Amino acid sequence: MTIDTLVAFAGIVFLLAIIPGPNALLILYTSLTQGKRFAVVNTLGVSVGFLIHAFISAQGLSLLLSQSAMAFSIFKWLGVAYLFWLGINNVKAALNQSELKIDPKKATLTPSLSSSFIKGLLTNLLNPKIVLFYLSIFPQFVSPQHLLEQSMLLGLTQAMVVSSWFLVVILFASKLKAMLTTPKVTKWLNYVSGGLFVSFGVSLASARL
């Protein structure tokens, strides 16, 4: 694999990264509601997801998944259910939020870094569109003689490119956070992000082989 080939692949994944999707929405929402640290851990989870996708693709499991309508359907609906779960949780958070007062005696539920990592990982892993992307793109960039090594290199490249873009998103969101942390704005942020997660789930439900 040449440097030119790697740069071409990096260009493709960058263009895909800047298109809003479930991963980007998760990072942006976490940045605005929980802070940079948790969003960075989200990003780490997403990045590990790309490496796992690359490994699975190199082992031929992605091809097997794409050739089995039942397996693809099960995988797809797991992804749909997960996006719906994220969306419904955000809407519930908005419904439960009090705009009038916050009782300081009540303990605040702080998300853990591990849960942030798992959210990023699952949002990426349970997306069959990424499986289809790897099946359509990887054969153009890897040679059969070095399938595993080159697939992992491409997965690492995608993880680095996407992470770099998400870090820009996180830094931008951190600048806006001071203006968006009032209870009223946070409530509507939960509503909007919840609706978007559900809409991504609906879009994913229409995915076909």
Where are the regions that the model predicts?
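Alpha-helical membrane-protein architecture signal
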Residues: 7, 11, 110-122, 149-153, ...
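Short, conserved phosphate/pyrophosphate- and ester-handling motifs at nucleotide-, phospho-/glycolipid
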Residues: 21, 127, 194
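Selective transmembrane alpha-helices of multi-pass membrane proteins
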Residues: 66-98, 162-165, 169, 177-209
